[in-house]
């Protein structure tokens, strides 16, 4: 018989619970089972800190619970997405983690893709079974030239490829939001990245409030909001819990979970790699904060978690993946993720064109 995803996690939990349990450490898991799994209410900020502080031997049970929450409140399907950068490098913002900033001595140089290349990438993405294709630009916000290119790209892709189109173009004006919605953009990505209290440590050229304004306009226009996190930048566990709670309050459709991959030439190039067990705790915590949200594996997981950790995360609350490469770093081969989903008996979400 094939091994199911639930069976695999139960095996992990059995091994963990053979050791003596520390009552105080596990109490939050009992609370979460009743509050999140049974009632569908996410953990609050103070509760999330306890998840992030769980001892190592409690991680399998936390992941098991997060997986059960995901299955009950989101279903079995895993959403697959590909991303492409229409404009790489030369960004005027100073996000300390990003090698695309033109303010740092980074090896990334400015590059524009033409429309035929975007269409080709969309076709290749759809061929993997992906239902989402996100067009990304390294900008503070789009100018008229970029908006015109986006419109042309959307039209061409829709003519030739059955896939939902998402965009990530920085901060938007109301007019730009309305245009993207009118053009049929399915989902818009604009990450909070980190907690409000830590944001000034990693970005100084724009404010947290400016990011929130774009997120609010996107939701009001009827597009799905994709709003994610980048963890492992030196934030405290309390700030990690703060971020999860702030994202939960925003109620995005999707939260991509990134782990810092320190890039040469950026202010965070010497930041240590996040511990894999801390990453797994974070995955469980974010799922328990947002039981109904699409929680997507995004950048840095290959470095932080490796193959085994990637598997554990998919059995611990993750229900979406980005296949292939990222914007400036290499990802896992698409087939590696797709084969893993088959092995775990996790069906890929089928394409349904948004209206």
Swiss-Prot record:
It comes from Paenarthrobacter aurescens (strain TC1). Its EC number is 2.8.1.6. Binds 1 [4Fe-4S] cluster. The cluster is coordinated with 3 cysteines and an exchangeable S-adenosyl-L-methionine. Binds 1 [2Fe-2S] cluster. The cluster is coordinated with 3 cysteines and 1 arginine. GO terms for biological process: biotin biosynthetic process. Catalyzes the conversion of dethiobiotin (DTB) to biotin by the insertion of a sulfur atom into dethiobiotin via a radical-based mechanism. The keyword RNA-binding does not apply. Pathway: Cofactor biosynthesis; biotin biosynthesis; biotin from 7,8-diaminononanoate: step 2/2. It catalyses: (4R,5S)-dethiobiotin + (sulfur carrier)-SH + 2 reduced [2Fe-2S]-[ferredoxin] + 2 S-adenosyl-L-methionine = (sulfur carrier)-H + biotin + 2 5'-deoxyadenosine + 2 L-methionine + 2 oxidized [2Fe-2S]-[ferredoxin]. CDD domains: Radical_SAM. This is Biotin synthase. The keyword Lyase does not apply. It is an enzyme of class 2 (transferase). GO terms for molecular function: 2 iron, 2 sulfur cluster binding; 4 iron, 4 sulfur cluster binding; biotin synthase activity; iron ion binding. [4Fe-4S] cluster binds at residues 91, 95, 98. Keywords: 2Fe-2S, 4Fe-4S, Biotin biosynthesis, Iron, Iron-sulfur, Metal-binding, S-adenosyl-L-methionine, Transferase. It comes from the Bacteria. PANTHER family: BIOTIN SYNTHASE, BIOTIN SYNTHASE, MITOCHONDRIAL. Homodimer. NCBIfam families: bioB (TIGR00433).
